[in-house]
């Protein structure tokens, strides 16, 4: 049983959705879309079970340097158990304590059911649980004035426009002129 748990949790990853990640994918919902500078996007890929919950530290350890709104994409999180739910609640608390906003999106059937049973929406706010990444980005735009104002670093992020292939090409073209 322990060997099974270990192998399953080895397949789980928590990572930031970066410009490089988007470009490496063949088709990605974020291709040709601007990620606002005040938004950071992370994803959980694989089952988020006992034994894999420490992988959320990828976000926690970077929290002081992250923008005021964090979107956690759960589309590829195939399963969650009570330890995973507790870890997500702890993450939500840490993000809230840092005066940032957390938006969850794209939850699959099994994790969504477990989250509903645990009343997770009461912990983070039902308005911060979205069906899709597009909906989460819209919600982030609605929250942005409040989040940017509340966050000490305000609008110190300017990296996202240049992350886009078209913006980077335009910048390179104007630099050559």
What is each PLM-predicted segment?
Residues 1-9:
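Canonical bilayer-spanning transmembrane alpha-helix
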Residues 9-177:
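Cytosolic C-terminal regulatory domains/tails of membrane transporters and channels
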């Amino acid at each position: 049983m322990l060997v099974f748990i270990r192998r399953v949790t080895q397949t789980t990853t928590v990572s930031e959705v970066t410009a490089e990640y988007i470009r490496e994918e063949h088709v990605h919902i974020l291709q040709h879309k601007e990620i606002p500078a005040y938004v950071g996007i992370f994803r959980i890929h694989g089952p988020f079970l006992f034994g894999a919950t420490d992988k959320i530290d990828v976000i926690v350890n970077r929290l002081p340097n992250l923008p005021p709104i964090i979107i956690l994409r759960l589309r590829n999180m195939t399963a969650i158990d009570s330890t995973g739910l507790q870890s997500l609640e702890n993450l939500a608390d840490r993000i809230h304590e840092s005066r940032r906003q957390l938006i969850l999106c794209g939850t699959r059937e099994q994790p969504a059911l477990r989250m509903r049973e645990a009343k997770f929406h009461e912990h983070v706010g039902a308005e911060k649980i979205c069906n899709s990444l597009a909906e989460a980005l819209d919600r982030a735009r609605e929250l942005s004035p409040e989040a940017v104002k509340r966050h000490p670093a305000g609008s110190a992020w300017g990296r996202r426009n240049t992350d886009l292939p078209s913006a980077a090409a335009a910048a390179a073209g104007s630099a050559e002129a």
